[in-house]
Design a protein with these regions (language model features):
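Generic detector of short, aliphatic-rich beta-strand segments that form the cores of beta-sheets
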Residues: 1-2, 256
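Thiamine diphosphate
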Residues: 3-77, 79-85, 89, 98-101, 157, 167, ...
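TRNA-recognition modules of translation machinery and tRNA-sensing kinases, especially anticodon-binding
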Residues: 94
Length: 266
């Protein structure tokens, strides 16, 4: 069963000689929690691959659609182990290139790592100044700028497949001359470990922030703050094709466009 796989992975890590990896649908990570907690406590290098990361599972319905799970597992990044380090690394990459870097980080780590991946296909994000792969390597900083403007009126944040939705919204906003910055935040823990100067460069003070998450809004609260706006889910999902649910729940460029305009008073 799922619970046993996580326990076996801990045993393999303790034995040594291998880097164990185990996975399941993200919603079923609940079964793994006791073993995951022990891996974090014992500094075990185990990789958890959790897929089907949102309501976009579709017709399987709310029993298979994680909502609160990302907020729960990201708490482990705030919990320190006995070495004084963040006890776990949680990564939710936004596209294939970020996933390459995330896997590289996971292999090179010495503590447990969670990779939270989508079910649906996701196109690579646009390149800003260099090749997309070079830019995606900045995932190692926990958060980085994907789309930018000289004087952004708003900073928009997301992780995973929601970053692409922000890009769609930014295209609509740009048509009205509204300058935006988009930040991909695969790991708040890694981002908080960066120098304050880097954090302030990515998220400048005095610029309003908008967050988009397919989980609980609190998932992004520490980054967006009380004065910004977070579009998230505060309820269970439904059984329907994921594109239908995207529209029902407002996960599209048009909604981002409308909410950001309201947020900045345009």
């Amino acid at each position: 069963c799922i619970r046993d796989r996580a326990c076996i992975a801990n045993g393999m890590a303790l034995h040594g000689g291998v880097i164990p990896a185990c996975g399941t649908f993200f919603v079923f990570s609940d079964y793994m929690k006791p073993a995951v907690r022990l891996a974090a406590l014992m500094h075990l290098h185990v990789i958890y691959i959790w897929t089907h990361d949102s309501f976009r599972v579709g017709e399987d319905g709310p029993t298979h659609q994680p909502v609160e799970h990302e907020a729960q597992i990201r708490l482990m990044e705030h919990l320190k182990n006995h070495r004084g380090e963040r006890s776990m690394l949680v990564l939710r990459p936004a596209d294939g290139e970020e996933t390459v870097t995330a896997w590289k980080l996971a292999i090179e780590e010495h503590r447990p790592v969670a990779l939270i991946l989508s079910r649906q296909n996701i196109k690579n994000l646009p390149a800003l100044n260099h090749s997309r792969r070079e830019e995606a390597a900045q995932l190692s900083k926990g958060a980085y700028i994907v789309v930018d403007a000289a004087k952004p009126a708003v900073v928009m944040l997301a992780s995973g497949s929601e970053v692409a939705t922000l890009v769609e919204g930014a295209e609509l906003l740009s048509k009205e001359g509204i300058a935006v910055r988009i930040v991909s935040v695969p790991s708040e823990g890694l981002f908080r470990d960066q120098p304050k100067s880097y954090q302030q460069t990515v998220l400048p003070q005095g610029v309003v922030r908008y967050g988009l998450t397919s989980g609980l809004p609190v998932t992004l609260l520490g980054l967006v703050g009380e004065n910004g706006m977070i579009h998230g889910l505060d309820h269970f999902g439904y059984s329907a094709p994921y594109k239908v649910l995207d529209e029902k729940f407002g996960y599209n460029g048009q909604t981002v466009y409308e909410e950001v305009k309201k947020l900045i008073g345009k």
